């Protein structure tokens, strides 16, 4: 009897010891070194791709996907992103340092079999329809993240120059600037635009094409593609499309669509000798800009735009894709068109880019929902915090275009909605009581919706700052200094006051990991000493950190 108990206690003690050791290993990973080591291999993959040495590419990809540091970064990405608390079909979560370290050590291509995705349906923005979402297991997510590290250098090196979606260091504002350059010149710029819409791009890409053309381990890729999904306890196979909700899916989709720009250049910019000829380029005025599966083609005449449409249709057909005839239309620039949430239109030969009506309606709808439905019982400071998050996100996206009128309109809408919110909370109070309860004078501003600690952002105080477009040929793995400077400059333009000072003091680098931060991505303030000791507003005590790095830091402190 005693022997039985001692054996059980011994196993429990051994298990606890193993967990403690794994936990310590996870906490002691040097993430800065991990980034450096993986980046070194990625640079070698880029150079091998440029030299078209595909055997070297394959060999280096193998080294990277079997590297400890690459596996650690893959697991880190999975356990720090927004889906870290959502399990796949196996119900497994990596929510302790020991489980995370065990995952790093268990990632392998040997005998790998991807589990089916867990299918759920989520509401679309218009709330009338629901769209399907596939949730892979944590292990499959980590495998995708690992192989994405090896595939991304190839994708970046072979990508179209005017492709901006789901790519390192590129954004919608870059696409906007390239379109501005193509369309803004008086009497010279192209008059016609082909607005492209691909039917269910991510869902219909041919598996045969992907397996034949994507430079990565074919067995692993096949597992990603053929995993299937489970809905209401029934297994459904996947015969086409990229892994839904998968980390690697945007890279696969981009690589599928890369080549459209080259095809258009060959047809409209080259002479009989196959060389780019400025005479043809200037006569046809064909330009191509793509963001993920949305694209625009400019042309001198509607006939050229339709010819470009047929070339793109042929290109897509080889990949199992097709254009939507209803949504792929040729438009005159004087009538205007919408792209990436902006409206592009010429008024008396002057190009104006502003937030589209659809984008304005969407933010008004979201704010209305926050104030009148979700926030009807919130305290004022909670409501202010939630609204400021929405306002900052929207204004940061649109502040590089002619958005002053839209910003002023949003201020007016906010006032009307907040007055309804306040009136609903105090139906028996008069206007004077409500106004003095919720609106105050702050500095030289009257009627500020505020509390003692928080105040609502004034939307039209957002400065309009022209975005500096990226070099089309820039590679994030080879031109690291260029991309780091762009990130730093973007922060200096967008931040103000103490936040700008913190950013400048750190040179835009994360305090925890030392890697560059992007001002448009998630970040938070880390306090070196407790706020109670130094005060909330002491800049010397404040540092910017990646949210992911802060989660790991907080977790490690908690476990200690």
Task: Report residues per predicted region.
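Conserved polymerase palm-domain catalytic core
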Residues: 106, 110, 158-162, 167, ...
């Amino acid at each position: 009897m005693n022997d039985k108990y001692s054996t059980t206690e011994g196993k429990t003690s051994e298990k606890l010891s193993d967990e403690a050791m794994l936990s310590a290993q996870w906490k002691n990973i040097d993430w800065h070194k991990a980034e450096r080591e993986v980046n070194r291999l990625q640079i070698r993959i880029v150079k091998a791709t440029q030299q078209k040495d595909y055997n070297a590419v394959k060999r280096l990809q193998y080294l990277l996907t079997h590297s400890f540091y690459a596996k650690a970064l893959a697991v880190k990405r999975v356990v720090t992103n927004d889906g870290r608390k959502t399990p796949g079909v196996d119900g497994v979560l990596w929510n302790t340092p020991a489980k995370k370290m065990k995952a790093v050590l268990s990632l392998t291509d040997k005998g790998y079999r991807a589990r089916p995705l867990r299918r759920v349906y989520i509401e679309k923005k218009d709330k009338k329809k629901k769209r399907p979402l596939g949730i892979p297991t944590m292990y499959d997510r980590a495998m995708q993240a690992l192989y994405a590290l090896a595939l991304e250098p190839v994708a970046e090196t072979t990508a179209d120059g005017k492709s901006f979606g789901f790519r390192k260091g590129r954004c919608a504002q870059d696409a906007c600037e390239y379109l501005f350059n193509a369309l803004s010149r008086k009497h010279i710029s192209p008059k016609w635009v082909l607005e492209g819409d691909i039917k269910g791009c991510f869902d219909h890409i041919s598996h045969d094409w992907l397996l034949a053309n994507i430079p990565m381990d074919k067995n692993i890729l096949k597992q990603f593609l053929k995993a299937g999904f489970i809905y209401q306890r029934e297994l459904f196979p996947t015969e086409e499309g990229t892994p839904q909700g998968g980390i690697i899916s945007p890279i696969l989709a981009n690589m599928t669509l890369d080549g459209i720009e080259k095809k258009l250049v060959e047809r409209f910019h080259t002479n009989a000798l196959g060389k780019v000829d400025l005479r043809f380029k200037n006569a046809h005025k064909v330009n191509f800009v793509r963001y993920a599966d949305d694209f625009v083609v400019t042309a001198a005449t509607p006939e050229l735009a339709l010819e470009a449409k047929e070339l793109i249709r042929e290109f897509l057909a080889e990949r199992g894709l097709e254009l939507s005839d209803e949504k792929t239309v040729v438009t005159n620039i004087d009538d205007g068109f919408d792209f990436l949430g902006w409206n592009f239109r010429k008024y008396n030969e002057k190009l104006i880019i502003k937030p589209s009506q659809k984008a304005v309606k969407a933010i008004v709808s979201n704010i209305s929902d926050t104030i009148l439905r979700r926030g009807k019982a919130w305290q004022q400071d909670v409501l202010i915090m939630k609204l400021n998050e929405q306002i900052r996100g929207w204004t940061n996206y649109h502040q590089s275009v002619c958005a002053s009128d839209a910003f002023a309109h949003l201020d007016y809408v906010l006032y009307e909605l907040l007055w309804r919110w306040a009136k609903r909370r105090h139906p028996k109070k008069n206007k004077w009581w409500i106004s003095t309860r919720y609106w105050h004078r702050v500095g030289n501003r009257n009627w500020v919706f505020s509390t003692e600690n928080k105040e609502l952002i004034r939307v039209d105080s957002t400065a309009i700052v022209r975005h500096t477009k990226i070099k089309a040929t820039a590679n994030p793995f080879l031109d690291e200094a260029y991309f780091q400077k762009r990130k730093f400059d973007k922060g200096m333009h967008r931040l103000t006051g103490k936040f700008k000072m913190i950013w400048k003091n750190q040179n835009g680098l994360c305090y925890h990991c030392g890697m560059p931060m992007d001002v448009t991505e998630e970040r938070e303030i880390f306090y070196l000493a407790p706020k109670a000791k130094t005060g909330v507003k002491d800049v010397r005590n404040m540092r910017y950190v990646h949210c992911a790095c802060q989660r790991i830091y907080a977790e490690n402190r908690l476990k200690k």
